[in-house]
């Protein structure tokens, strides 16, 4: 009986830990990815559900996250400090557009799609984009 209780307790702990981390996502800010692309986020197009949290983790000191546009009613946080981890919980469905301030012209941008709502796709397409970010933004929006 004690062995059964022990295994049930271990299973319960594993289930609780798995559930607690199920809504947490991590995106790395990279100087170079495994494919050789420079100045990129580990995920450039990320899909999450309402209430999920994403944490951006810098792999060097020169990266950050600056929010450029999002859906109506969404409160966009201030840009993060270079080299600092930042998290955001997404409460409003739609498309969110962000970039790395120092490397935006090199195409270091990303999109987060919350839920299945892409109704603000046109507004995101009209948002500011510089250098290589213009082509990448168009390509990412084309995937939606």
Set out the residue ranges of the language-model regions.
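Positively charged n-region of N-terminal signal peptides that target proteins for export
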Residues: 1-6
């Amino acid at each position: 009986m004690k062995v059964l209780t022990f295994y049930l307790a271990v299973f319960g702990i594993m289930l609780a830990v798995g559930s607690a981390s199920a809504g947490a996502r991590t995106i790395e800010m990279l100087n170079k990815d495994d494919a050789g692309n420079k100045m990129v986020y580990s995920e450039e197009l990320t899909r999450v559900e309402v209430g999920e949290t994403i944490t951006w983790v810098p792999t060097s000191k020169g990266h950050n996250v600056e929010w450029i546009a999002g859906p109506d009613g969404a409160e966009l946080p201030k840009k993060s400090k270079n080299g600092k981890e930042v998290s955001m919980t997404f409460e409003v469905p739609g498309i969110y557009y962000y970039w790395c301030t120092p490397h935006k012209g090199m195409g270091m941008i990303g999109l987060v799609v919350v839920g299945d709502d892409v109704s603000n796709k046109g507004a995101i397409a009209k948002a500011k984009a510089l250098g290589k970010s213009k082509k990448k933004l168009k390509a990412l929006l084309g995937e939606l």
